[in-house]
Amino acid sequence: MVILFRGPSRLHQASNPKPPGSSNERRRRGSTRSKLSIDEVRNVKLAAPPGARFKGYTSFVVQDLVIRRHVVNFRCERWQMPDGGTMTAALLDGIDGHFGPQLRRFVLAQYHQGQMTVPRLVTLLRSFGILICKRQVLRLLIERQDDFLTEARDTLRAGLSSAAWITVDDTGARHKATNGFCTQIGNAHFAWFGTTGSKSRLNFLELLRAGHDDYVINAEALAYMRQRALAAHVIARLVEHPERRFVGRKAWNAHLEALGIPALKVNPDPVMVATEGALWGSVRAHGFPDTVIVSDDAGQFNVGQHGLCWVHSERLVHKLDAFTAENRAAQATVRDLIWQFYADLKAYRCHPTKRRKTALRARFDRIFTRMTGFVTLDRLLMRLNANKPELLMVLDRPEIPLHTNGSENDIRCQVTRRKVSAGTRSDIGRDCRDAFLGLVKTCAKLEIAFWDYLGDRFVVPGCQAIPPLPKIILARARSP
């Protein structure tokens, strides 16, 4: 079977307003020299003819890169104590094993940010004169990375606790020769990835817990269960029990068994809905605010305040097959109306008013309740009209985006990694890949060079100090 890829909708690009005074001419780049710090100055001599007068210098700045092997033999002093014991001088900060901080920094940057494969990285290092093998490179990538894994987890917690909105997406991922899924969560300040074997709503709620392992029965959990139409007598059993917090899946399952919930024959599945509710209660209990989750309409992401991506919604109209001139004309008309409406939604985000909100709601109804005579298109418009609260979430929350382009851009690095290296074979390898790719994207969003970030974390001499990323995220979220 051949699958033809349809290009992305031009909805987003077509409705981007040009700034006042802008033109189609390319903007000239600024001076490169002003952005550079000079490391070395060389004077170039000239054999001047007799009678010439010296008139100073003409500067010509050249950027270069110095890559060379640097082997250090640390001779640590040893002293014998009066009691017969021996003391040895400690190595400098940043020295951990027989490969120095600069080499470890280079390996992580090339593999995660440069998307290199391990064999090619080994070949490159050997060409520099480094004596290293594939197994040693793998150890540099996955061993003793607890600090980075913790910072990636804390980045997610800081991002979720301070976010007015997040966008989410997922893609396929291979782990231990089994198909799985990688979920992206992020916004303008952070990005995080998590690879699991499922893409269910239960899985998404577990990811939103950001490493916490508890199940909580609180007001938010009960509201979720009622929204999902869980039987009232099942909710009553959970409410009547005095214990409301359970640490670990075993404790939660034991609690459900004690209440006799798994044995109930009701619809929807009481265990699944109760577990989802307890997970949602845990998410809210750990500081998840009234955040809007913007998605592409995948069912697993429909929790809490939920908004939909307009680009994905319009793409459904764009992808319809029209076989007659009348159908094509109807399709083009609807797409044009949606484009214009989308542009006005973007303008509303910049200057929201109550009057414009009312007008846009009425205009939405006119567009998505129209009958075109193109049956497939009419059914699609009815389907989109049913999503009115999610599509018009921006009217009540103007700060949220109208699309999930940010998530799609972020998750491309996972797709590239999958194509380059297929999949992971160990849990620590999977966790390190997800954590470092998330840190790479987060650094880019915070305008921090990943190379500088690694230099600070590996205590490379002369590197600038980089504060913990979660602190920067919280500070950015508080700033206007």
Question: Language-model segments: which ranges?
Answer:
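Mobile genetic element proteins and their domesticated derivatives, centered on retroelements
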Residues: 1, 48, 81, 107, ...
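Short, flexible loop/hinge motifs at secondary-structure junctions
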Residues: 1-98, 168, 214-274, 283
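Conserved catalytic alpha/beta cores of large enzymes that bind or transform nucleotide phosphates
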Residues: 93, 108-110, 122, 321-353
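Two-metal-ion RNase H-like nuclease active-site motif
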Residues: 162-175, 295
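Catalytic nucleotidyl-transfer cores of nucleotide-processing enzymes
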Residues: 177-334
